[in-house]
Amino acid sequence: MNVGTAHSEVNPNTRVMNSRGIWLSYVLAIGLLHIVLLSIPFVSVPVVWTLTNLIHNMGMYIFLHTVKGTPFETPDQGKARLLTHWEQMDYGVQFTASRKFLTITPIVLYFLTSFYTKYDQIHFVLNTVSLMSVLIPKLPQLHGVRIFGINKY
C-alpha cells in the first residue's frame, strides 16, 4: 500500500483519456448537449446540429489545443508546463486509440451535421471551418509547433 500517493503516473494528463468509461461519457455529453439545444423553442433542427458541432469543436479546441500545463503538482520538473493537453496525451505517442477516437469524433459529428443541415452552404462553410480548426492542430507534424508564436508561453 502506497501511503500518500493517489496515482502512479508522473503526469495524470497523459492517461486520462484511457480511463474506463471516458469515451462513453464523452459521447453521452455530446448527445446531452444536442438534446439540450433541441429543447430550445423556435430553433430549427439544422441550426441545432450546427450549434452542437460548433460548441463541441470550440470546447475541444480550447481544452485540448489551447490550455497548457497540468492542474497537478507533477515531479516531471515542469516538462508539461509548455505542452497542451493534446501534446501530453499518451506521453506524446502518435496514433494511439485515444488520439484516433478524439480525431474521428469531430469528423463523424461533421458528417451528421452536414447530412441533417442538407448541405446548406452557410452551415457547410461554418462546420467545415470548425472541423479544420480542430483537425489541423492534431496533425503529428504540428506536435509542439506554435503557428505565428500563438500560445507560445
From Swiss-Prot:
| GO CC, alphabetical | endoplasmic reticulum; endoplasmic reticulum membrane; plasma membrane; secretory granule membrane; serine palmitoyltransferase complex; specific granule membrane
Q: Where is this region: Important for ceramide level-sensing?
A: 1-17
**Major location category of this protein:** endoplasmic reticulum
Which GO BP terms sit in this record? ceramide metabolic process; intracellular sphingolipid homeostasis; motor behavior; myelination; negative regulation of B cell apoptotic process; negative regulation of ceramide biosynthetic process; positive regulation of autophagy; positive regulation of protein localization to nucleus
PTM comment, free text: When hydroxylated at Pro-137, ubiquitinated via 'Lys-48'-linkage, leading to proteasomal degradation. In endothelial cells, ORMDL3 proteasomal degradation is controlled by the sphingosine 1-phosphate receptor signaling pathway.
Ranges annotated as spanning the membrane: 22-44, 45-63, 101-117, 122-139
The stretches that face the Lumenal side, renumbered to this chain, are 118-121
Mutation effect (H85A): No effect on the negative regulation of SPT complex activity in the presence of ceramides
Q: Where does this polypeptide localize?
A: Endoplasmic reticulum membrane
Cytoplasmic compartment residues = 1-21, 64-100, 140-153
Chain positions found as Hydroxyproline: P137
According to the entry, the disease involved is: Asthma: The most common chronic disease affecting children and young adults. It is a complex genetic disorder with a heterogeneous phenotype, largely attributed to the interactions among many genes and between these genes and the environment. It is characterized by recurrent attacks of paroxysmal dyspnea, with wheezing due to spasmodic contraction of the bronchi.
Q: Which family does it belong to?
A: Belongs to the ORM family.
Assembly, in brief, is: Ceramide-sensitive subunit of the serine palmitoyltransferase (SPT) complex, which is also composed of SPTLC1, SPTLC2/3 and SPTSSA/B.
Stated role: Plays an essential role in the homeostatic regulation of sphingolipid de novo biosynthesis by modulating the activity of the serine palmitoyltransferase (SPT) in response to ceramide levels. When complexed to SPT, the binding of ceramides to its N-terminus stabilizes a conformation that block SPT substrate entry, hence preventing SPT catalytic activity. Through this mechanism, maintains ceramide levels at sufficient concentrations for the production of complex sphingolipids, but which prevents the accumulation of ceramides to levels that trigger apoptosis.
Protein's recorded name: ORM1-like protein 3
Source organism of the structure: Homo sapiens (Human)
